[in-house]
């Protein structure tokens, strides 16, 4: 039973008896003197006599658990306590011996695992009555998920909404399951997909997650880790029919789970790991262990850990947290479990357990012992950024990837069945209906089949619908044999007097016609396999924009981002419009960005957020603005002229003098003649396809993406019919579709060898290069008006993203307290980066680029770099698939926090994938040039433009770029050889210390090791030239690469030295590019050809945050003012009837004392673990110990962090309750997010202007009526209730004495600011009272938000309510609340609480922000713009 390998004469340092295989303790124990060596101790041990009293700690668990590495490490440390002896009960004893024969012990550590006889352990505890570390009776409950959830609910711990399905014949009332296609109903509770299905037994790890059909359907099947897999995707969508299960709501966690490990109620270690539901691949390190990352818990999460520990009476307890929607939810409690591979945790755990045991048992053994109180030396690990600028925010707007050609058919329908369908799905509410779900499309198909059957019986019956159109509708809906829900949709629009009547204007005779519906069927437009590869590769390339790392895990590009993301230092959100191709592009990009594997469906569901509910990325393409109609009509008129372009045509069609536009017009000359040629080529093409179909060899011919010759012919025949109308005129709107189709066939179906496609591509591209960009406006003013109309919500969101970046980081920080000796190999870069990725369609990309080009960001006459950028953009002919607009925000920590140089913005752009016809003709840009603090002089001066005329630039992805002083590229410059390119594909480029004689002192790059040494991380061999590491080496975003290169410089293989001379000719600035697919060795199964993606080009790298913020605000305001003028008359007529009662009252923060966690030594160990446990790997859990270095406190009144406000304000658009008007919308929208016991805490907002500018409002106070008037005029739709500004100011003045809920640490400048704010507040309120008549101009729909109390008291007096978005005249939409971290933590310095109260009082007063009217109004409805549908064919 007992394995005692040591002699009876042992030293005072007790040992850990493991049998003959014990390898010893390894390191000195706590009781050892540091000057004693191990040999001296061993010699002394023979002469020493062990002390009489010994506390025996018994370990009763299965051998696999009791001899695991974590248990061994902890017990070794536990043995270093004097008076403690650890004994392990063997598995044979536990299983086969009666409990009476088990040796007695004073303290028992026992826990259940598979095969463990828990009944015997309970019997033993009753027999011997030892001190239990983990309660045994409660372990029965932990084995049943139903009991776990019941206990969690009783303790008031948040958990996902769930229902239990008990398949028990004795209780049939608990087994009511109704399964639908996209939902299940369990005992009356409905769970729409995605939902989770868990077996009730906690020992059964076969958890299934079911996905909605709109995301591809199927399920992810989770299981206990087997090798490198933890889940697998299955196409099965039906729930299990046998067994009892818990069904619960799926929580979107952005692909990471948090595992929490408690040791007593006051210690909790947390780690993040990749969610097994994401792709099922277990990330392992070089030793084969699952990679996990340290995470800092918030105050509320520490409270949850304490509750779990106490409720289940388990001192050592592990549980799973899901962070979603601004809250933390417990989804599983595992009982006894240890952290793996954390030396710090082993030390902490052993110390806490030892102290707990000694505190409980030492008195009865008369052992002199007290808890050690010496201060622990925990140095702060310094950051490595030095003086480099730190990447803080990346915002990218990206077009979707390569797709199949989009196709559309319109028909007018009048059958009652279509009207019934329209009514059933609520079409009459808005007059429009969009049907995408499989069951909806099935209804349309059923109606179509029924009408066709009736037409066969009665060809001359009452059915008015055209047979040909109905048959096409039927064939499209029947394609593929099933509805995927993302590649076909039907739109119905109601016309009260028939479609033609509405089209032809006010015709009295027409108005008597019966109403009809316009049915628009859209299909195609699916993301192709090539598009998926493009998106995934671009995602991999994007990794390299983030801070890099060192150590064992730095063997591949972009490893810095991966560890950044998993440690929650990366605040990532991916948004996509509701189009399937856009969502799949976003999912594929996320897969590459985060090195995920497996199917796209689970990634899409968990990582991609739909932004279609508020117009952020979607636009109602069927309703064009009046400006778009004018532009389209003028464009069609010019292109219908059968004559060569004259000077006046150039003035009319190309007033902006765009280089690409002029080039295309030169090619076209006579538009009608070119259209004749295009039409003849299409006729020839359809003739060739028909001939191929007659060829017996083509019977089973499969084209790209499973298309057949019949479908291909259908595509081209429809274009042939539609392009030339019966009148002989051409429908110019079909030109983009023709170009789309021929580009697709040349790229993907080139093997057919159809004649004339190259010429058709050349001519249709020339026409498309005129039509497509000019549809978004011809003159600068039109381009800007249409652009802002498309992307106003997105512009506001980008502005919010930039302003939210400099927020308090205490929520997302890694653990700041870390032993230096534990820091080696820890994946924890000290950065916090916010990333917002917006995937959308061509319209938004065109529009956003137009805003930057024509909105007046900079004066090109004064800024040479911006002039070069505009010249480059002017030469871009097409914004192709995967076009990117990237905004990067850096912070220079060496600058004064109030300085304009503190934050630095860069603007980058890529026109997406290369067209197949563009070899050698692409315009050259300025290179990718992130600013570097070590090359300040290069910021604005580098990168002179090459000749923008076509044909001058190289087609190489890493083509040469000259800097200003350099001579032009010589004709003899060799291109980079395939050998170098191949080697680059297999390894990460790192710095070589070779120096160049060229200006600027660039350091060039070569391979660090052969491809075979490349660590496999999911990148494969397709990671060629992803990002210009030449730039990254000196870039503010990747300073660590320099260190990496210096440390690895001597490892350069001979192969790279052989090409050093050639490398010296490599351009100084290479581009961020994805160029793998051109190389023959880099093929991709299922892809005919994946075009190269153009590298990112820097448009400007010396912008300040203030410049960009003011520019975006100005553009938004200009649009708002323009619409206000159009609706001023309507506003004036409505405004007199508005009441101005019930003014907005700002929410008050209530004071609540910090939660006191009392130490209760008389209780079992799960109630307290003693003072030494107050410092945990997740930071101090108890407020009794105040650490000056810690940045978190403990409060039972948590506050949501700024992510909530961001999602709320930037996306959700504060809700307006019908009938209650504007006076209620001000606080309703925000209060939805708070629990009843919480009080709203204002999120941190830091103004980019110095504090000294706070005094500015004082000077502008006399003009307070003007901003109010401006705001009033800016709204085109009246609200029903109007707040009175004068009353509001009065109320703010009266409420000025309320104290704040929490007292953060106050910095000195902020104290000055607070006094200034008090002065401003008093002056403003006094002025409001004196000038109530002037001020009382009603501001409809606008709630003026008072000055905010924020972390460190950055009072944003100079920046008005950033996001008071009121969606006027439209129903309130659901507000997405995806927040990675739920709560904001503040440090509370107890000693300074009293003296800081006065400063708090000053700041808690309501301060109306009057110097800048609200910038944030949604796009108002243009009452004059009528939808004019296209001609029905």
Swiss-Prot record:
Catalysed transformations (reactions): 1D-myo-inositol hexakisphosphate + ATP = 1-diphospho-1D-myo-inositol 2,3,4,5,6-pentakisphosphate + ADP; 5-diphospho-1D-myo-inositol 1,2,3,4,6-pentakisphosphate + ATP + H(+) = 1,5-bis(diphospho)-1D-myo-inositol 2,3,4,6-tetrakisphosphate + ADP
GO process annotations (BP): inositol metabolic process; inositol phosphate biosynthetic process; inositol phosphate metabolic process
MF annotations from Gene Ontology: 5-diphosphoinositol pentakisphosphate 1-kinase activity; ATP binding; diphosphoinositol pentakisphosphate kinase activity; inositol hexakisphosphate 1-kinase activity; inositol hexakisphosphate 5-kinase activity; inositol hexakisphosphate kinase activity; inositol-1,3,4,5,6-pentakisphosphate kinase activity
UniProt keywords, alphabetically: ATP-binding, Cell membrane, Cytoplasm, Kinase, Membrane, Nucleotide-binding, Phosphoprotein, Transferase
Stretches the record annotates as Polyphosphoinositide-binding domain: 382-453
PROSITE patterns per the UniProt record, alphabetical: HIS_ACID_PHOSPHAT_1
EC number: 2.7.4.24
Polar residues bias spans: 1005-1020, 1134-1143, 1187-1199, 1236-1250
Broad class of the protein's primary localization: cytoplasm
Annotated ATP binding sites: 145, 198, 205, 224, 248-251, 257-259, 275, 320, 332-334
GO cellular component: cytosol; plasma membrane
Tissue: Widely expressed, with a higher expression in skeletal muscle, heart and brain.
Phosphoserine modified-residue sites: 944, 987, 1037, 1073, 1145, 1152
Residues the entry annotates as binding substrate: 64-65, 224-225, 259, 273, 337-340
InterPro entries: Acid_Pase_AS, His_Pase_clade-2, His_Pase_VIP1, His_PPase_superfam, VIP1_N
Pfam families the UniProt entry points to: His_Phos_2, PPIP5K2_N
Region described as Disordered: 915-1020, 1134-1199, 1235-1257
Subcellular location: Cytoplasm, Cytosol; Cell membrane
Record-stated family: Belongs to the histidine acid phosphatase family. VIP1 subfamily.
PANTHER family according to UniProt: DIPHOSPHOINOSITOL PENTAKISPHOSPHATE KINASE, INOSITOL HEXAKISPHOSPHATE AND DIPHOSPHOINOSITOL-PENTAKISPHOSPHATE KINASE 1
Domain-related comment: The C-terminal acid phosphatase-like domain binds PtdIns(3,4,5)P3 and InsP6. Despite its similarity with the phosphatase domain of histidine acid phosphatases, it has no phosphatase activity.
Function: Bifunctional inositol kinase that acts in concert with the IP6K kinases IP6K1, IP6K2 and IP6K3 to synthesize the diphosphate group-containing inositol pyrophosphates diphosphoinositol pentakisphosphate, PP-InsP5, and bis-diphosphoinositol tetrakisphosphate, (PP)2-InsP4. PP-InsP5 and (PP)2-InsP4, also respectively called InsP7 and InsP8, regulate a variety of cellular processes, including apoptosis, vesicle trafficking, cytoskeletal dynamics, exocytosis, insulin signaling and neutrophil activation.
Protein name, per record: Inositol hexakisphosphate and diphosphoinositol-pentakisphosphate kinase 1
Source organism of this protein record: Homo sapiens
């Amino acid at each position: 039973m007992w394995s005692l390998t040591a002699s009876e004469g042992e030293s005072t340092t007790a040992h850990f008896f493991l049998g003959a295989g014990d390898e010893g303790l390894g390191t000195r124990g706590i009781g050892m003197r540091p000057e004693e060596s191990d040999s001296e101790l061993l010699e002394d041990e023979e002469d020493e006599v062990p002390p009489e009293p010994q506390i025996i700690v018994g370990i009763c668990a299965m051998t696999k658990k009791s001899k695991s590495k974590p248990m061994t490490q902890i017990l070794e440390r536990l043995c270093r306590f004097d008076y403690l002896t650890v004994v392990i009960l063997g598995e044979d004893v536990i299983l086969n011996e009666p409990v009476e024969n088990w040796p007695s012990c004073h303290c028992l550590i026992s826990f259940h695992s598979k095969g463990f006889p828990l009944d015997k352990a309970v019997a033993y505890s009753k027999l011997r009555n030892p001190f239990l570390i983990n309660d045994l009776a409660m372990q029965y409950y932990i084995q049943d998920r139903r009991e776990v959830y019941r206990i969690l609910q009783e303790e008031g711990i948040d958990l996902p909404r769930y229902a239990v399905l008990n398949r028990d014949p004795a209780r049939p009332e608990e087994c009511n399951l109704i399964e639908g296609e996209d939902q299940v109903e369990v005992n009356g509770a409905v769970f729409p997909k995605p939902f989770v299905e868990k077996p009730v037994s906690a020992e059964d790890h076969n958890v299934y997650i079911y996905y909605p059909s709109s995301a591809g359907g199927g399920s992810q099947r989770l299981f206990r880790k087997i090798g490198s897999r933890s889940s697998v995707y299955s196409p099965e969508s039906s729930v299990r029919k046998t067994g009892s299960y818990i069904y619960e709501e799926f929580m979107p966690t952005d692909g990471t789970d948090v595992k929490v490990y408690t040791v007593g109620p006051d210690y909790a270690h947390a780690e993040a790991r990749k969610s097994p539901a994401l792709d099922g691949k277990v990330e392992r390190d070089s030793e084969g262990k699952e990679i996990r990352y340290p995470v800092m818990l918030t105050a509320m999460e520490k409270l949850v850990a304490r509750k779990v520990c106490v409720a289940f009476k388990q001192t050592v307890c592990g549980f799973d947290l899901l962070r979603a929607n601004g809250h933390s939810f417990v989804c599983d409690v595992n009982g006894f479990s240890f952290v793996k591979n954390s030396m710090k945790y082993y030390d902490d755990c052993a110390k806490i357990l030892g102290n707990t045991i000694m505190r409980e048992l030492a008195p009865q053994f008369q052992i002199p012992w007290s808890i050690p109180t010496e201060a622990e030396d925990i140095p702060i690990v310094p950051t490595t950024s030095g003086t480099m600028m730190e990447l803080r925010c990346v915002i990218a707007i990206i077009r979707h990837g390569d797709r199949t050609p989009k196709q559309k058919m319109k028909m007018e329908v009048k059958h009652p069945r279509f009207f019934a369908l329209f009514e059933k799905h609520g079409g009459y509410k808005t007059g429009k209906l969009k049907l995408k779900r499989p069951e909806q499309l099935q209804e349309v198909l059923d109606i179509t089949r029924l009408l066709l059957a009736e037409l066969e019986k009665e060809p001359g019956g009452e059915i008015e619908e055209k047979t040909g159109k109905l048959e096409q509708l039927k064939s499209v809906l029947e394609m593929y044999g099933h509805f995927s829900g993302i590649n076909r949709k039907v739109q119905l629009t109601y016309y009260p007097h028939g479609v033609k009547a509405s089209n032809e204007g006010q015709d009295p005779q027409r108005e008597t016609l019966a109403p009809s519906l316009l049915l628009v069927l859209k299909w195609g437009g699916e993301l192709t396999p090539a598009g998926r590869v493009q998106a995934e590769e671009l995602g991999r390339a994007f990794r390299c924009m983030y801070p890099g790392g060192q150590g064992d895990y730095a063997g591949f590009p972009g490893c810095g981002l991966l560890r950044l993301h998993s440690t929650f230092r990366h605040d990532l959100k991916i948004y996509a419009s509701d189009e399937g191709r856009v969502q799949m592009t976003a999912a594929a990009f996320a897969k590459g960005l985060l090195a995920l594997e497996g199917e796209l469906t689970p990634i899409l569901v968990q990582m991609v957020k739909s932004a279609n509910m508020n117009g952020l990325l979607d636009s109602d393409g069927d309703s064009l603005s009046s400006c778009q109609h004018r532009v389209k009509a003028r464009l069609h008129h010019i292109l219908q002229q059968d004559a060569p372009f004259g000077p006046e045509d150039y003035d009319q069609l190309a007033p902006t003098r765009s280089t690409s536009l002029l080039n295309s017009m030169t090619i076209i000359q006579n538009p009608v003649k070119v259209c004749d040629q295009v039409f003849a080529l299409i006729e020839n093409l359809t003739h060739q396809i028909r001939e191929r179909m007659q060829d017996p060899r083509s019977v089973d011919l499969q084209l790209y993406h499973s298309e057949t010759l019949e479908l291909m012919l259908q595509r081209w025949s429809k274009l042939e019919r539609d392009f030339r109308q019966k009148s002989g005129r051409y429908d110019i709107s079909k030109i983009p579709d023709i170009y789309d189709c021929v580009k697709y066939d040349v790229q993907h179906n080139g093997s057919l060898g159809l004649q004339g496609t190259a010429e058709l591509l050349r001519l249709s591209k020339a026409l498309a290069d005129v039509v497509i960009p000019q549809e978004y406006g011809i003159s600068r003013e039109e381009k800007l008006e249409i652009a802002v109309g498309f992307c106003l919500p997105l512009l506001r969101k980008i502005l919010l993203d930039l302003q939210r970046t400099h927020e308090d980081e205490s929520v997302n920080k890694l653990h700041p307290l870390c032993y230096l000796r534990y820091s080696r190999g820890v994946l924890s870069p000290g950065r916090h980066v916010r990333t917002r990725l917006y995937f959308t369609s061509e319209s938004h990309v065109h529009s956003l680029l137009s805003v930057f080009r024509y909105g007046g960001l900079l004066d090109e006459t004064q800024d040479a770099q911006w002039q070069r950028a505009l010249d480059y953009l002017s030469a871009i002919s097409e914004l192709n698939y995967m076009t990117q607009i990237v905004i990067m925000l850096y912070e220079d920590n060496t600058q004064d926090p109030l300085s304009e140089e503190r934050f630095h913005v860069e603007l980058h752009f890529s026109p997406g994938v290369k067209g197949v016809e563009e070899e050698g003709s692409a315009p050259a840009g300025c290179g990718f040039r992130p600013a570097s603090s070590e090359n300040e002089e290069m910021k604005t001066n580098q990168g002179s433009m090459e000749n923008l005329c076509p044909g001058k630039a190289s087609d190489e992805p890493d083509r040469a770029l000259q800097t200003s002083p350099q001579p032009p590229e010589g004709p003899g410059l060799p291109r980079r050889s395939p050998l170098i390119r191949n080697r680059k594909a297999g390894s990460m480029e790192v710095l070589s210390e070779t120096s160049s004689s060229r200006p600027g002192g660039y350091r060039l790059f070569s391979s660090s090791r052969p491809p075979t040494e490349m660590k496999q991380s999911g990148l494969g061999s397709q990671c060629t030239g992803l990002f210009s590491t030449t730039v990254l080496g000196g870039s503010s975003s990747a300073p660590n690469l320099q260190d990496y290169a210096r440390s690895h410089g001597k490892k350069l293989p001979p192969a790279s030295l052989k090409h050093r001379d050639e490398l010296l000719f490599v351009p100084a600035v290479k581009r961020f590019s994805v160029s793998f697919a051109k190389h023959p060795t880099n093929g991709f199964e299922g892809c005919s050809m994946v075009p190269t993606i153009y590298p990112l080009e820097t448009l400007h790298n010396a912008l300040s945050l203030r410049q960009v913020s003011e520019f975006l605000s100005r553009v938004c305001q200009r649009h708002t003012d323009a619409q206000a003028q159009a609706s001023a008359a309507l506003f004036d007529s409505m405004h007199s009837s508005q009441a101005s009662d019930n003014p907005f009252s700002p929410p008050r923060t209530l004071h609540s004392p910090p939660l006191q966690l009392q130490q209760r030594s008389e209780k079992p160990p799960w109630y307290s673990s003693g003072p030494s446990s107050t410092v945990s790997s997740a930071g101090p859990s108890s407020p009794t110990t105040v650490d000056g270095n810690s940045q978190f406190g403990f409060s039972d009144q948590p506050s949501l962090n700024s992510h909530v406000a961001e999602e709320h304000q930037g996306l959700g658009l504060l809700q307006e309750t019908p009938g209650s008007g504007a006076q209620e919308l001000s606080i309703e929208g925000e209060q939805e997010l708070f629990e009843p016991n919480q009080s709203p805490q204002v999120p941190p907002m830091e103004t980019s202007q110095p504090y000294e500018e706070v005094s500015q409002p004082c000077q502008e106070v006399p003009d307070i009526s003007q901003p109010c008037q401006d705001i009033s005029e800016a709204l085109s739709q009246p609200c029903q209730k109007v707040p009175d500004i004068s009353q509001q100011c009065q109320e703010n003045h009266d409420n000025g004495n309320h104290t704040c809920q929490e007292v953060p640490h106050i910095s000195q400048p902020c104290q000055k600011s607070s006094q200034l704010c008090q002065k401003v507040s008093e002056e403003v309120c006094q002025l409001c009272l004196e000038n109530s008549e002037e001020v009382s101009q009603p501001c409809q729909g606008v709630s003026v938000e008072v000055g905010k109390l924020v972390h460190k008291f950055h009072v944003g007096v100079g920046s008005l309510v950033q996001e008071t978005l009121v969606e006027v005249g439209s129903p309130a939409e659901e507000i997405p609340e995806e927040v990675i971290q739920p709560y904001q933590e503040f440090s509370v310095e107890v000693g300074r609480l009293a003296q800081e109260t006065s400063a708090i009082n000053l700041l808690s007063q309501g301060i109306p922000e009057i110097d800048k009217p609200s910038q944030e109004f949604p796009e108002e409805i243009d009452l004059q713009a009528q939808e004019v549908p296209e001609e029905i064919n």
